[in-house]
């Protein structure tokens, strides 16, 4: 069922449905989808079922409006007291149900009498509410006083049980009611504002509307939220608001993550930040894209984090997303989601599968994805020695739960293995050992929607492993490809499916074999290394933007708000990254690089200290048209004096 909640589908005085905010075109598209392009059977549901004169005038007016809007119909029927007994068959045969405007309590009573809530179960057409009809779609209907005497009547019921099609409570016809009074009480300041301390209402001018698809509401046009005794604008004309509350954890680090907040806010999401920095010390770009902020003393103190989320939930209502997009906080994100019943991300019971390298193996196997052989350090020195004898040296020791190259070591023989165990005698059980595989390190980076479908894909290539860059203090050079190789896309998608991941940015690492390896594959095949359920680190998201002329931060935000990509992708190119070291003497200066690459140079800046071990001290990013140009860029930028 597709639902439209309107004050009125027309602007005042217009003879047809308004085209503002794309309303008429959207309704026509929904009707065509519901009927297969055939004229719909329309059922109007009266708000005054016993007032024949009023009901007949509404039938004529709505019929004229529908036809003036260019919508052909098979039939238009009014459901009121006269044919109430036929309600089941009328609803069953309708393609388009319109809940008419009028007196909310009167219509509400009639809807219950005909048992409309039950009749709508399984309805797959279009339902449109007008004024009272929209208000009665809510689970709990806010029936604010409207007629003389209602505001001062102690028996008048402001809260009614509705159709439970939405939890959105509307105060329609903003232009007409903003300064209206009932029984000498101002409707907003004296009635709605006080009632909003424990509720949240939305109000907009005629021409605005809410569309609900697959249970997800989106508001179109200028609108205001009334809550906690005040009114604030939540959406502007010709823009959308998604009724979502997103808690973004540590939005100030990495430094580019404010773009995620900006993208979500642009989509009408309420962006609520939690960090351990004073608000005034947050970057201006971030502050401008936060709707609220809660400072904790320590982001690792779960009790403080729990209180922060609880405070937002009390103030803003149901929390829809909790996200950091940061490997370090994945476990805490999952725990908070689980404790607050936020179902849009990974829960506690699945976190080990994406954090522990030993657990990852099980899911790789489910997807038929080859991986390096592995043994847990907890098996002990003797068994790890036997493992190394079977696979051959070198072997790689790495934390079972860890990110980046931290704690990773290449062990070349029994002597180095024994020394490693001696040095790690207190925590060797926290490590795993894997056979050493030679090949090209590549990544499959993608954003997936809630259906497990990729809405954006990218491939980056890392000719020198991060472990080697860190341990040898090398320059960092890697690139983003123009396209994702078909075989990599296939194994990347299979991996995501095996891990059961949806609604996420993913960064999956693979080795592309440089020779045939028994049990793993042929030269050129891909072998699973590890999964990272977050965006790639460092400047890679920016490189993806440059490579594909898009905005991956916005695409992620589109996934959050709309479950689809709305940001287009342009013509693709190669984008290369060079991270130079302050400790090295280069033949070509900073200015030489800028002069040589000119407009091809997309970015050059100092790398944050926290990232410099991996990425170098000075970053240069260039957009080029061929792999040969990328290699020439690397050679020129990293050439040193002998």
Predicted regions mapped to residue ranges:
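C-terminal and late-domain segments of enzyme folds
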Residues: 1-37, 56, 143, 147-240
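N-terminal beta1-alpha1 cap of cysteine-dependent amidohydrolase-like domains
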Residues: 1-96, 100
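Catalytic nucleophile loop
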Residues: 98-100, 121-140, 326
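ATP-binding N-terminal substructure of ATP-dependent carboxylate-amine bond-forming enzymes
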Residues: 240-349, 627-641
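ATP-dependent carboxylate/phosphate-activation module, predominantly the ATP-grasp catalytic core
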Residues: 415, 435-501, 505, 512, ...
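Peripheral (often C-terminal) accessory segments that flank ATP-dependent C-N-forming ligase machineries
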Residues: 555-642
């Amino acid at each position: 069922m597709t639902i439209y909640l309107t004050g009125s589908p027309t602007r005042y005085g217009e003879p047809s449905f308004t085209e503002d905010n794309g309303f008429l075109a959207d309704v026509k598209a929904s009707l065509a989808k519901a009927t297969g392009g055939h004229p719909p059977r329309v059922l109007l549901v009266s708000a005054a079922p016993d007032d024949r004169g009023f009901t007949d005038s509404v039938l004529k007016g709505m019929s004229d409006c529908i036809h003036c809007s260019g919508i052909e119909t098979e039939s238009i029927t009014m459901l009121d007291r006269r044919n109430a007994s036929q309600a089941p068959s009328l609803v069953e045969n309708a393609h388009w149900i319109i809940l008419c405007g009028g007196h909310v309590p009167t219509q509400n009573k009639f809807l219950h009498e005909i048992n409309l809530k039950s009749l709508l179960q399984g309805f797959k057409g279009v339902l449109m509410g007008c004024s009272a009809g929209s208000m009665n779609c809510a689970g709990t209907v806010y029936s604010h006083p409207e007629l003389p005497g209602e505001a001062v009547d102690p028996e008048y019921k402001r809260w009614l049980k509705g159709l439970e099609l939405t939890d959105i409570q509307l105060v329609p016809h903003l232009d007409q009611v903003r300064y209206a009074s009932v029984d000498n009480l101002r409707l907003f300041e004296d009635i709605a504002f006080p009632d909003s301390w424990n509720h949240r209402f939305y109000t907009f001018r005629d021409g605005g509307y809410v569309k609900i698809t697959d249970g997800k509401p989106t508001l179109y046009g200028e609108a205001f939220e009334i809550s906690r005794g005040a009114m604030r604008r939540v959406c502007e004309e010709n823009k959308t608001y998604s009724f979502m509350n997103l808690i973004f954890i540590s939005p100030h680090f990495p430094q580019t993550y404010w773009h995620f907040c900006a993208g979500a806010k642009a989509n009408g999401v309420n962006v609520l930040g939690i960090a351990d920095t004073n608000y005034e010390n947050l970057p201006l770009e971030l502050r401008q894209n936060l709707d609220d902020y809660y400072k904790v003393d320590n982001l690792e103190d779960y009790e403080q984090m729990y209180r922060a989320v609880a405070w937002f939930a009390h103030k803003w209502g149901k929390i829809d997303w909790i996200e950091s997009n940061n490997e370090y906080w994945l476990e805490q994100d999952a725990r908070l989601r689980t404790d607050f019943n936020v179902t849009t991300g990974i829960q506690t019971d699945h976190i080990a599968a994406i954090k522990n390298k030993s657990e990852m193996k099980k899911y790789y196997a489910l997807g038929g994805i080859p991986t390096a052989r592995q043994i847990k350090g907890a098996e002990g020195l003797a068994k790890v020695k036997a493992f190394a004898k079977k696979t051959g040296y070198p072997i790689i020791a790495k934390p079972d739960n860890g990110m980046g190259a931290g704690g990773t070591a290449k062990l070349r023989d029994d002597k180095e293995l024994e020394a490693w165990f001696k040095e790690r005698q207190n925590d060797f059980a926290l490590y795993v050992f894997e056979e050493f595989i030679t090949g090209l390190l590549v990544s499959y980076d993608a954003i997936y929607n809630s259906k497990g479908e990729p809405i954006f894909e990218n491939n980056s290539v890392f000719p020198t492993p991060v472990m080697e860059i860190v341990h040898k203090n090398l320059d960092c050079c890697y690139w983003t490809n123009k396209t994702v190789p078909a075989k990599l896309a296939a194994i990347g998608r299979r991996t995501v499916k095996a891990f059961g991941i949806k609604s996420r940015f993913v960064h999956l690492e693979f080795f592309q074999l440089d020779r045939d390896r028994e049990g793993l594959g042929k030269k050129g095949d891909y072998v699973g290394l590890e999964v990272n359920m977050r965006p790639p680190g460092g400047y890679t998201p920016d490189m993806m933007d440059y490579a594909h002329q898009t905005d991956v931060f916005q695409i992620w935000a589109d996934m959050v708000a709309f479950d689809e990509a709305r940001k287009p992708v342009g013509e693709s190119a190669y984008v290369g990254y060079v991270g130079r070291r302050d400790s090295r003497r280069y033949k070509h200066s900073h200015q030489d690089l800028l002069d040589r690459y000119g407009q091809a140079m997309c970015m050059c800046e100092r790398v944050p200290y926290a990232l410099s071990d991996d990425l170098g001290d000075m970053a240069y990013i260039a957009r080029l048209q061929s792999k040969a140009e990328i290699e020439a860029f690397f050679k020129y930028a990293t050439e040193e004096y002998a």
